[in-house]
Amino acid sequence: MAEVTVSELAKSVGAPVERILSQMQQAGLTHQSPDDVVSDEEKQKLLTFLKSSHGETVAEPKKITLKRKTTTTLKTGSGSGRKTVNVEVRKKRTYVKRDEVADEIEESAAVAEAEVAKVEEPVVEPVQEPEVAAEPEVVEAPEPEPVVEAIEEAPVEEPAAPAAPVISQTTTASSLVDDAEEMRIRAASARIKAEEERLAAIEKARKEKAAKPAPAPGPAAAAKEDARPTKHVEDLAKLKKPHDKKDEEFDEDGKKHNKKAGKAVKKVAGPKKVASALDYVEDKEEIEEVIHAPKPKRLSANRGPRPVIKVSNKHGFKKPTGKITYDVEIPETITVGELAQRMNVKAGEVVKCLMKMGTMATVNQPIDQETAQLVVEELGHKAVLISADAIEIKLQEEVAANVDGETIPRAPIVTVMGHVDHGKTSLLDYIRKAKVASGEAGGITQHIGAYRVQTSHGELTFLDTPGHAAFTAMRARGAQCTDVVILVVAADDGVMPQTEEAVQHARAAGVPLVVAINKMDKESADPDRVKNELSAKEVIPEDWGGDTQFIEVSAHTGQGIEELLEAVALQAELLELSAPKDVPARGVVVESRMDKGRGVVATVLVQGGDLKSGDILLAGQSFGRVRAMTNEFGEQVKTAGPSSPVEILGLDTPPQAGDEFLVVPDERKAREVAEFRAERERQEKLQRQQAAKLENMFAGIGENETKVLSVVLKTDVRGSLEAIQAALLDIGNDEVQVNIVGGGVGGITGNDVNLALTTGAIVLGFNVRADASARKLAETESIEIRYYSIIYQLIDEVKSALSGMLDPERVEEIVGIAEVRETFRSPKFGQVAGCMVVEGSVHRNKPIRVLRENVVIFEGELESLRRFKDDVSEVRNGTECGIGVKNYDVKVGDQIEVFDVKEVAREL
C-alpha cells in the first residue's frame, strides 16, 4: 500500500487530524505535523495500539459481512390483464472464523451452566447475566438455526446486525481497497460504542424491572426453570449441525412467516411458538426485543442448498355452482363477436350456434336483431331488445324538457328553385342588391346559398339552390327546411326537367308554391305557355281557378319584384310562422366545408331558439363547441335567432348537408350520440356489403369482370361532394363503373395522392387545389390530378373516360358475293369452284360464309383465289375467278359471301 500523510489518513478514517496525531503519540510514533508521511508499518503499529487499548489483541477481523441486492421483474395475471411487478431480493452473508466460533460455543455453554447454579426463584435475576455473555452474538449471526431462547442471549444478539453494517455503511469503497487497517479501526470503535449502548439499555431495563414486585414462582415454575438450562445446552450443542429451514419458513397452514418475526417465535417448532417462548422468558418486554431481533445468517462453511420457497397454488376462483344467466341487450344490428362478449362466451360458440341454425357467419359479421335473439335464447340467456335510436330519443327528450320559452313570430324561409339558367340567382341578386350570379363559376349556382334580406314587407331568409340535375339532393334539402318555395320558370324556355323535379320536392315537403315567370323582358317570352305546361303538372294559376300565385318578373329590369315579395309575404302570413325564443337552438345544416386556417366551417339555418357562441352543438355525426359565428356579410355575431343563417366554427368534422342540429347541455352526451351514429352507419354499411357479397358470389362466374375507374374526389363544400358522387355513380353500366375510393372536403393533400397511388385512381378536384407536397408527389409517381370549376365538365370527362374503357362493338360488313357456276377437282387444292363475282369484290384474306338457298351452312376462309392461272388477292364485280374453300366442298348454285369485321367505339 502506498504511503500517505497523516491528514489523508484522518480523512480516509473520518476522524479529526488532532485526534489521530494524539493517538499516534500515545502509540509511540514521532509524527507531529499533518503533512508527515505514515508508512504501512506505522499504520499497523497504530492499529495494534488501538486494539490493545480497547481490549482486543486479534489483528484480523472475526467476521466479514457481505451484502447483495438484485432487482428483477415478475409478470402476474389479474382480472384486468397482465401486470409487471418489481421484485427486490436482498442477500446478506456473514463469514466467521471457525476456531473462534467453537471457542464462543464453549464459552456460551459455560455461561449457561453457571446460570443454572445461580437461578433460583426470582424471575428478574436472569436479566442481569447478559452483560457478561458478550460473545454469543457472533455465534447467532451466521447460523439461522434456533439456538438459545433464554433472555440472556437475546439482547446479546442485537449488536450482531449493527456491527457488520457499521463497517459497510461508514466506509467507502475506495477506503476498503486502499486501507484495510482504517476499516479495522472504525469497526473496533463502532463495536465498542454499540456494546456500551447495549449494556446501558440492559441496565436500564433491569432497573425498571427491579422496581416492580416479582410474583413468587410456584412449584411448576421452579421445575420449568430447573429444566431450562439443560435445554440451552442441548440447543448450543446443535449449532454446528446443518438444519432445514422449512419449519422456520412455513407454518402448518402453508403461510409464510413474517421475515421480521423474532427468533423466540421461529426457533420453537409447532403451533405454540409464542407460548414456548414465554416458557423461557418471563419478561414480555424483552420478548418483544427477541421477536424483533435481526434474522441470523447461515455460516458460509455450513451453507446448504438454497431453500425452496413454497407458494400456495390454491387460486381464488371458485367454480360457480349454477349456470349464470345474463340479460343481453340486443340492438337492431350487432356483430357476432360483440354478442359473444355480452353473453360472456367464446365467439366460436356463437358461430357454432348460428351454423346449427343454418346461418354461416364470421366473428366480425353483423347479424340482425331477430337472429341474435334466437342465439341468445338458444344459449340459455335472456334477450333484451333495445331500439337503435334509444340513446338519441333519450337526448331529445332531455333537450325537449328545457323548451319552455315563449314563442315569437319569425321570418319566413324562402327557397328559390327551378331549372338551370332560368335566372334564380339573378332574381335573388336583384332582391339582395348584390352581384352574386356573375361570380358563380360558369354562371351557375353550385352551392346552397343562405341570405337574409330586409325588404319593405319585412325580413326574409332566402335559400338559393342549384338547378343542375346533379343537385337533386340539395333541392330536396332546400324544400325540407323551407316555408315557401319560389319556382322560377323562364318565359322563353318553359317547363324543364328540373322544374318538374322542384314541383315534386315542394309537394313532398308540403310547402306552398309561388311561381315567378322570369325573363319577361325578352321578346320571345310566352307566359301562357308556362301556365299551360304547369297546369299539366297540376299547378293551377289563381286566375285560372287554382291556388298558386303566378307573378311575371324580370331579374334585369326589376319588373314584378315587389309583387313577388308581396306574394311571398302574404303566403307566409297565412302560415302564421312562430318559433320559441330563449331556449336551446335547433335547426338544419345547409352546407359545410373544410377551410384551411379555420377548420370546419358549417352554414346552418336556425329554426328555433337562440344559437350562442360557446354552445355545444350536435349535428349528425359531428359535434363541437361553437367558437365563432358570422352572418352572410362576414360580420361576427354572438347570437343567432330563429330563421337566421350563420356560419359557425368549432365542429370536429364537416357534417352532412341536411343534417339537423341541436344544442345539447353536455359535451359528453354529444360525443356519445355522435359516436353512436357513426357506429350505426358503419354497421349498416357492413351489412349492405355482406348482403352484396352473398348475392353476387356466383354471379361473376363465367363472365368478364366489370371494369372500374377509381377516383379520389375532393370538393370545396359537402353539398357539392354529395352531388358529384351521386352523378358519377349513376354514369356506369354493367361493364364499366366509377369507384370513388376516397372523397372529402378541402384541398388535395399528400394523403390523397398516396391513396390514389395505392388504388390506381385519378384525383379530381372541384374548386380546390393541391398543395406543394401533393403536387410534387403526384409528379414523381405520375399520378394525374385534374381540376374543375364547372360540374358539367367534370361529369363529361369522367363519362368519356368510362366510354374509352368499354369494349368496342364488332360490326360485320359484306364486301362481296360470288356465285358458284361450276366445280372441278385440282390435284393440288382438291375441289375448286368456278365462280362469278356478282356483287362487290372478293378478297383473299377475309372470312367467308357459304350460303345454300340463302341459308348459312358454313363459315370459314378461302384457301386460294385465282384469276385464270394467276394467284390474286382481290377479284372485282363481274369477273370470273376460281375459289378454293378450305375444308369444305361447295356445290353448283351456292353463294360465297365475303365479309369484314370492323370495331366501332362505344359510348355511354
Curated annotation (Swiss-Prot):
Bias type Low complexity, positions: 157-166
Coiled coil segments of this chain: none
Region Disordered, annotated ranges: 122-180, 203-267
Main location, first listed in the record: cytoplasm
Region (G2): 443-447
Region G3: start-end pairs: 464-467
Transmembrane residue ranges: none
Basic and acidic residues bias: start-end ranges: 223-248
PROSITE patterns attached to this UniProt entry: G_TR_2, IF2
Swiss-Prot/TrEMBL keywords: Cytoplasm, GTP-binding, Initiation factor, Nucleotide-binding, Protein biosynthesis
Nucleotide-binding recorded as keyword: yes
Region of interest (G5), residue spans: 554-556
Biased composition regions of type Acidic residues, renumbered to the chain: 132-143
Taxonomic superkingdom: Bacteria
Pfam families the record matches: EF-G_D2, GTP_EFTU, IF-2, IF2_assoc, IF2_N
Cellular component terms per the entry's GO annotation: cytosol
Family per record: Belongs to the TRAFAC class translation factor GTPase superfamily. Classic translation factor GTPase family. IF-2 subfamily.
Function: One of the essential components for the initiation of protein synthesis. Protects formylmethionyl-tRNA from spontaneous hydrolysis and promotes its binding to the 30S ribosomal subunits. Also involved in the hydrolysis of GTP during the formation of the 70S ribosomal complex.
NCBIfam families: IF-2, small_GTP
UniProt protein name: Translation initiation factor IF-2
Source organism: Saccharophagus degradans (strain 2-40 / ATCC 43961 / DSM 17024)
Name of the gene this protein is made from: infB
